[in-house]
Design a protein with these regions (language model features):
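Hydrophobic alpha-helix immediately C-terminal to the catalytic Tyr-X-X-X-Lys motif of short-chain
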Residues: 1, 5, 9, 39, ...
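Active-site Tyr-X1-5-Lys
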Residues: 1-18, 23, 47-49
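The catalytic Tyr-centered alpha-helix of NAD(P)H-dependent dehydrogenases
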Residues: 2, 22, 36-40, 64-68
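Short beta-strand/turn micro-motifs at beta-sheet edges
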Residues: 12, 43, 145-148
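Flexible, glycine-rich beta-alpha linker
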Residues: 15-38
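C-terminal substrate-binding subdomain of Rossmann-fold SDR/epimerase-dehydratase oxidoreductases
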Residues: 48-190
């Protein structure tokens, strides 16, 4: 793990090294146009075009999301107030949201009422047969676990050591992303 190497260098050479562990980062300029965009970008793009999004899960999976401006604010504090030796800091909201919860917020903020389609996670990965083959193919159950995992980070260390806490709640952050993505998508239509 990279953190262990960083800690080894910090310990061996007396270096100051801080690793930032990002939760799911979202914010304006998320790439919603690529073939397989991040969840937030995909959801906004499909709603913008009045299409039914297909989520490859039951929608109950929960993740911790952090708005990009909050991440930057913490990164700046870490640079301005470095701790001696090695440090690892979770950059997170300390809250988790399900696919269904985020979709409901985006649907409402965009003034839409489009029901999502929930499919088995295996349908998503079927588009990538190269993942399963070869000498180091990934087992389907590992990919399924990746889709269905729960993640929530504890940002107590960031709050206590760096005096930081996230300022942008999920609804405000999604609203900003929707605004930016809508402007971008409208620009493509001109």
């Amino acid at each position: 793990c990279a953190e262990r190497f960083a800690q080894s260098f910090a310990d061996t050479y007396g270096m100051t090294v801080t690793c930032l562990r990002f939760a799911n980062v979202y914010g304006p300029h998320i790439d919603g146009l690529r073939k397989q965009p991040p969840f937030v970008g995909y959801m906004i793009r499909e709603l913008y075009y009045d299409r039914t999004p297909e989520f490859h899960s039951d929608g109950n999976q929960r993740r911790d999301y952090i708005y990009v401006d909050d991440l930057i604010a913490l990164a700046l504090r870490v640079v301005e107030h470095p701790q001696k030796g090695f440090d690892a800091v979770n950059v997170s909201s300390n809250q988790s949201y399900s696919v269904r919860e985020l979709y409901a917020i985006a649907n409402r903020l965009m003034g839409k009422n489009i029901e999502a389609k929930y499919c088995p996670s295996s349908h998503y990965w079927a588009k990538y047969p190269e993942l399963y083959g070869g000498a180091y193919g990934i087992k389907p159950e590992i990919l399924d676990h990746e889709v269905n995992k729960f993640s929530q980070c504890d940002n107590t260390h960031a709050r206590e050591v760096y005096g930081w806490q996230p300022q942008v709640d999920i609804e405000t952050g999604l609203g900003r992303v929707i605004e930016a993505e809508t402007r971008m998508l409208e620009g493509l239509e001109k």
